[in-house]
Amino acid sequence: PDLRALGRAAREARALLVVDNTVASAFGCNPLRLGAALSLEALDRVCAGEAPRKLVAASVARSQLKRHRVDAAAECAHALLEGSGLAALDLSSDEAEVLEHGLETLDTRMQAHFDRARALAEYLAANEMVCNVRYPGLTSHPDHAVATGILEHGFGPAVEFDLIDRTAGELIEALPDEFRTSPAGGAITRLSAPRGKQGSTIRLFAGTDDPLIVAATLDNALRNLATL
């Protein structure tokens, strides 16, 4: 979405714009600089998929500090975290260590996620066995122009596409187990069915694995399904 436009609308309405920045991550987007008052981000990719539980970071814009409106933003963040069953500021030493190690390699890993997502999106866009490939880095995406001014270092790690005459569950079952069981934010590309296994939509989060191998594995599974 156009965060600048949403930020302006929020200010005019005297509202707080809250952004879930998990997919793009702080590496790929800075909502606070674009007009958000509060940014929330699950730290799966920061921790390279190794966190023992869900960790979420909440960031408040400096403008909120200057206006002494921290309370409203902080209360909003606290309510959202509590509603997700998450507690604040209670990291164990192991969790802190995983987070620290993840931050040391974050930029390199995130760039790899983004680059591989783009490569896989381009492969899928040229694949006649799928349709409606959705990735903001493709010029065919309706938000491509907006995304170029909102996102940084690429266009994020996520790609969605639809299958033709096959269900998401069929494709996922035809792929090696690691494509569905690998931890979120980890090194292995992960596929899921956001509209259920009986739907046709696949969501792919690129890992740091070889995109050529991932594309070949997907291609083989799609071709096998086409012969059934």
Regions found by a protein language model. Give the residues of each.
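Short, solvent-exposed beta-strand edge segments and adjacent coil->beta transition regions
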Residues: R53, A96, G154-A158, G199-R203
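Conserved PLP-enzyme active-site core in the AAT-like
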Residues: P1-M129, R134, S140
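Short acidic, gly/pro-rich beta-turn/loop elements at beta-sheet edges
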Residues: K66-H68, G169, V214
